[in-house]
Swiss-Prot record:
Chain segments annotated as transmembrane: none
Biological role stated in the UniProt entry: The proteasome is a multicatalytic proteinase complex which is characterized by its ability to cleave peptides with Arg, Phe, Tyr, Leu, and Glu adjacent to the leaving group at neutral or slightly basic pH. The proteasome has an ATP-dependent proteolytic activity. This subunit is involved in antigen processing to generate class I binding peptides. May participate in the generation of spliced peptides resulting from the ligation of two separate proteasomal cleavage products that are not contiguous in the parental protein. Required for adipocyte differentiation.
Location relative to the cell: Cytoplasm; Nucleus
Keywords in alphabetical order: Cytoplasm, Differentiation, Hydrolase, Immunity, Nucleus, Protease, Proteasome, Threonine protease, Zymogen
Primary site of residence: cytoplasm
Organism: Rattus norvegicus (Rat)
PTMs per UniProt: Autocleaved. The resulting N-terminal Thr residue of the mature subunit is responsible for the nucleophile proteolytic activity.
Protein name: Proteasome subunit beta type-8
Length: 276
């Protein structure tokens, strides 16, 4: 119950946090996206509007410059008859500088929800970890898991409150709920899209080319793994900001499983040898 204490709830069950009985006459008002948390300011970073704060240190000409983040990645996800496949590269770059090649760009929100990272790593990690907290609070309050649609809507609402403040995030939220597998795209403008297949990051055009040529709804698990694997490998080969290893997850009815973490260089050599 430490999470409840952190969010301002006293010991014991709070009446307004409990599920409201339809005949009780009580009102259930979850607030913005914080599900009646007493201190929602915990979810809001303090300080000035970030873009204006940074511009205040420059001269008149520099204050008119658009702040641009230096980043790059390749992430993808698609639905098929056996669930959802999520595959990402692992290179973290800042322009031409490669910071590390061992970043897991999949945020494990809970056993039935996954989120991907594309854009500014700090923004993606912070907001998706906050989403994980909200999903946990939803479970504690309602006694059931949040749906994939509702989780993606929460993240979209968070982004809408910070539109124009310099956030950089393009995330895919995927999971399994009562309606089956779900896949949504959410970005820093609050855009929220549902679809069968998405790819984000600087290498997404190359990944889409591979996926479009081999995607079918009736893929077997092994065929789906191979399609996602090839899409990431060929994207990293053509996109200088992507690389490292292929981290792949399979979202099933009983939760996600991590399929593999394989070096893209080894896979590329394997594919080339197979064509000789």
């Amino acid at each position: 119950m430490a999470l409840l204490d952190l969010c301002g709830a006293p010991r014991g069950q709070r009446p307004e946090w409990a599920a409201v009985d339809a005949g009780s006459g009580l009102r259930s008002d979850p607030g913005h996206y914080s599900f009646s948390v007493q201190a929602p300011e915990l979810a809001l970073p303090r300080g000035m509007q970030p873009t204006e704060f940074l511009r205040s240190f420059g001269d008149d000409q520099e204050r008119k410059v658009q702040i641009e983040m230096a980043h790059g990645t390749t992430t993808l996800a698609f639905k098929f008859q056996h669930g959802v496949i999520v595959a990402v590269d692992s290179r973290a770059s800042a322009g031409s500088y490669i910071a590390t090649i061992r970043v897991n760009k999949v945020i494990e929100i809970n056993p039935y929800l996954l989120g991907t990272m594309s854009g500014c790593a700090a923004d993606c990690q912070y907001w998706e970890r906050l989403l994980a907290k909200e999903c946990r609070l939803y479970y504690l309050r309602n006694g059931e898991r949040i749906s994939v649609s509702a989780a993606s809507k929460l993240l979209s609402n968070m982004m809408l409150q910070y539109r124009g403040m310099g956030l950089s995030m393009g995330s895919m939220i995927c999971g399994w709920d009562k309606k089956g597998p779900g896949l949504y795209y959410v970005d820093d403008n609050g855009t929220r899209l549902s679809g069968q297949m998405f790819s984000t990051g600087s290498g997404n055009t190359y990944a889409y080319g591979v996926m479009d040529s081999g995607y079918r709804q009736d893929l077997s698990p092994e065929e789906a793994y191979d399609l996602a694997r090839r899409a990431i490998v060929y994207a990293t080969h053509r996109d200088s900001y992507s690389g490292g290893v292929v981290n792949m997850y399979h979202m099933k009815k009983d939760g996600w499983v991590k399929v593999e973490s394989t070096d893209v260089s080894d896979l590329l050599h394997k594919y080339r040898e197979a064509t000789l």
